[in-house]
């Protein structure tokens, strides 16, 4: 009877977890398409100079520069297009990440079309800045319209130059690195005037307000996030932006836009005082970025201002190399402390076997192996409880409705027979956090995107296209259920719920990532084998 209740407990915990996730999604306000001017001016311009940051997106896409005028950069990882007006990155494609499994086209992250405006903007503001919401953007010159990282070349520099009316020369340098998704975006100001220049660099990501393509089984986030010296990582959704503009002073920090598996982020120098800001423009664009330190450039002097921009997958190693907190955009939820070691163990197994499906099987065997002592104790406790059923039935008949005496007698019996009535629950309670943590690892880890297993399972990050594994998982649950003797005293309602549980789980798992179904299926098969082995040992001891 206890084993049946444990299976019910699994089902209730599992369904509760899914309902809780869906409730969080449903309770979030819907994205706002447009904002009034009062929201745009919520931050104090006198304090933060946020009004100096250009906000010319309301005219897009009519103002988009013709494709032939864009500067195209090709590396081993990125295809980047830069608008010479302002030097903004208006297009990025990830060479080694396909748009779809059966499509060789690269995944496009940043783009500027009739449907979406998602770009990375940077510039110089302040008294002598060349980018302004009032004066307009600088029009840069470049030696070529096409740049490529050649074979044997590890670094590619793309310089853009602008000569101001006062004679000062501004060079905006994009530096690309082989094997990397981060781009150095630096400014060099050559003050050829007889007056001191004052400039401040900013970088911001502009994104059309768009609702995340999320579901109960695959909850994902699309929106902004930031980090400061006081807040290591915080999501800041489009709804949050509509409610309140960010204006946080910090040493270092970063600002990012997130979506499933991919991220774009501005990372200013870690030792500089910066301001992380956000806004919603009148054209319905969500903006998040940074304003850096103010630099005074003496006459005849040269000043370099640096920053980094990352545009690519949520690769934890690559993100950590840029900023110690940027890898937190791979959000494992409240069980991150459990998910991180699971992820590292999964990576370790994959490095050995070279197959993510096999790695999931190995991690399942590891988890089941670690929990085996508890599993054995669970089945032993359940066997003892079954042997006590006649005595418990006798007590129930003897004490009738006197629950107090019945409870005291039961506790004395458990103590005498050395039985823990809750002993069967502990392994179940330990399995659920592991299951949920692995669920987030499989959902968030870009390494599993388009990762094949075998036969018809060509992508472990999406559902089984033929629903074979969910059905096998349901069958395995049914077998486990039949191996557990049904107590005659069990409530009829519980019996019905137990009979339907494999069906309910099968339906739920139809839309789960194949990797997660594989974990649960293998776990069930191992549990069946363990159960048969443990029961054989118990029968030798006279416990059935």
UniProtKB/Swiss-Prot annotation:
GO terms for molecular function: membrane insertase activity. One of its GO terms (cellular component) is plasma membrane. Keywords: Cell inner membrane, Cell membrane, Chaperone, Membrane, Protein transport, Transmembrane, Transmembrane helix, Transport. It is found in: Cell inner membrane. Signal peptide: none annotated. Disulfide bonds: none annotated. The chain crosses the membrane at residues 6-26, 345-365, 423-443, 460-480, 503-523. InterPro entries: Membr_insert_YidC (IPR019998), Membr_insert_YidC_N (IPR028053), YidC/ALB3/OXA1/COX18 (IPR001708), YidC/Oxa/ALB_C (IPR028055), YidC_ALB_C (IPR047196), YidC_periplasmic_sf (IPR038221). GO terms for biological process: protein insertion into membrane; protein transport. It is a multi-pass membrane protein. The keyword Protein transport applies. Interacts with the Sec translocase complex via SecD. Specifically interacts with transmembrane segments of nascent integral membrane proteins during membrane integration. Required for the insertion and/or proper folding and/or complex formation of integral membrane proteins into the membrane. Involved in integration of membrane proteins that insert both dependently and independently of the Sec translocase complex, as well as at least some lipoproteins. Aids folding of multispanning membrane proteins. Belongs to the OXA1/ALB3/YidC family. Type 1 subfamily. This is Membrane protein insertase YidC. It comes from Shewanella woodyi (strain ATCC 51908 / MS32).
């Amino acid at each position: 009877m206890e084993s049946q209740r444990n299976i019910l407990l699994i089902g209730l915990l599992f369904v509760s977890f899914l309902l809780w996730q869906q409730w969080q999604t449903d309770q979030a306000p819907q994205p706002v398409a447009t904002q009034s001017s009062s929201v745009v001016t919520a931050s104090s311009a006198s304090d933060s100079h946020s009004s100096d940051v250009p906000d010319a997106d309301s005219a897009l896409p009519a103002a988009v520069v013709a494709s032939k005028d864009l500067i195209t950069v090709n590396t081993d990882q990125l295809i980047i297009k830069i608008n010479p007006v302002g030097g903004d990155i208006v297009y990025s494609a990830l060479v080694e990440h396909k748009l779809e499994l059966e499509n060789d086209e690269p995944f496009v992250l940043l783009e500027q079309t009739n449907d979406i405006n998602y770009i990375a903007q940077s510039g110089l503001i302040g008294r002598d800045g060349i980018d302004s919401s009032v004066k307009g953007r600088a029009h840069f010159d470049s030696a070529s319209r096409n740049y490529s990282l050649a074979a044997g070349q590890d670094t590619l520099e793309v310089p853009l130059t602008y000569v101001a009316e006062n004679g000062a020369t501004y060079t905006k340098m994009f530096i690309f690195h082989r094997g990397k998704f981060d781009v150095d975006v630096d400014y060099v100001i050559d003050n050829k005037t007889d007056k001191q220049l004052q400039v401040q660099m900013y970088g911001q990501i502009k994104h059309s307000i768009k609702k995340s393509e999320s579901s109960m089984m695959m909850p994902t986030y699309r929106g902004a996030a930031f980090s400061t010296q006081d807040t290591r990582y915080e999501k800041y959704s489009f709804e949050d932006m509509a409610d309140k503009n960010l204006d946080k002073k910090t040493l270092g920090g970063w600002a990012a836009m997130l979506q499933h598996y991919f991220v774009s982020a501005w990372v200013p120098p870690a030792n500089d005082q910066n301001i992380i800001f956000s806004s919603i423009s009148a054209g319905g664009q969500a903006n998040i970025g940074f304003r850096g330190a103010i630099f005074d450039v003496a006459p005849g002097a040269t000043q370099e201002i640096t920053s980094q921009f990352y545009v690519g997958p949520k690769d934890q190693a690559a993100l950590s190399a840029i900023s110690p907190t940027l890898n937190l955009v791979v959000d494992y939820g409240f069980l991150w402390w459990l998910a991180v070691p699971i992820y590292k163990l999964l990576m370790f197994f994959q490095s050995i076997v070279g197959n993510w499906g096999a790695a999931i099987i190995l991690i399942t065997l590891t988890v089941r192996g670690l929990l085996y002592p508890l599993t054995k104790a669970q089945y032993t406790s359940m066997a003892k409880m079954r042997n006590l059923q006649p005595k418990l039935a006798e007590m129930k008949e003897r004490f009738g409705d006197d629950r107090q005496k019945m409870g005291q007698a039961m506790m004395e019996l458990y103590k005498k027979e050395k039985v823990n009535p809750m002993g069967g629950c502990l392994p179940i309670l330990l399995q659920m956090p592991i299951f949920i943590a692995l669920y987030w690892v499989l959902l968030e880890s870009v390494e599993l995107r388009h990762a094949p297993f075998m036969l018809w399972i060509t992508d472990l990050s999406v559902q089984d296209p033929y629903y074979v594994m969910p059905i096998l998982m349901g069958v395995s649950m049914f077998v486990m259920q039949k191996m557990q003797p049904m107590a005659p005293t069990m409530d009829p309602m519980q019996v019905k719920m137990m009979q339907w549980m494999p069906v309910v789980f099968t339906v739920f798992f139809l839309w789960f990532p194949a990797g997660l179904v594989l974990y649960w299926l293998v776990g069930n098969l191992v549990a069946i084998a363990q159960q048969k082995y443990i029961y054989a040992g118990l029968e030798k001891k006279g416990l059935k």
